[in-house]
Amino acid sequence: MTDTATVSNWVTAYRTAWGSNLDADIRALFTDDGDYLFGPSDEPVHGVDAIVATWLSRAEGPDDTTFSWNVLGIDGDLAFVQGKVDYTDGQLFDNLWVIRFAPDGRASSFTEWWMKRPGSK
């Protein structure tokens, strides 16, 4: 069963990977057969190799954002995280993440929703 510490550790590792864009940091987040949905209606990117390649093709600079977040809830192996991302260029986004965890604390599935905040560039 997933707990708040597992979610916190994963989100911290996600932010590390977001800033570093290092293969090993990204790979550490997902199971070998994990799925990443960059939007709720997107086809999943399946498998850690494909996740790493897709992530790197969309990579942002390490100092482009500030990020705050909180856990909205946990149900079994499923966690719900609310985030706020502020880009240095003035773009502001609200996020909802749905993360299904494997027993080892990696994500077997990750879906993100991101919505531009009113007043954002």
Language model segments and positions:
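Short, low-complexity N-terminal intrinsically disordered segments enriched in polar/charged residues
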Residues: 1-24, 28-32, 121
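Short, charged low-complexity linear motifs
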Residues: 1-4, 15, 23-24, 37-41, ...
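Short, hydrophobic secondary-structure boundary micro-motifs
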Residues: 27, 38-39, 66-68
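Short, charge- and proline-biased low-complexity linear segments
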Residues: 28-36, 53, 110
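A short gly/proline-enriched turn/hairpin at secondary-structure junctions
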Residues: 35-44, 113
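Short beta-edge strand/loop motif at the mouth of beta-sheet-based domains
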Residues: 42-53
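A beta-strand edge to alpha-helix "cap/lid" segment located at domain peripheries
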Residues: 52-121
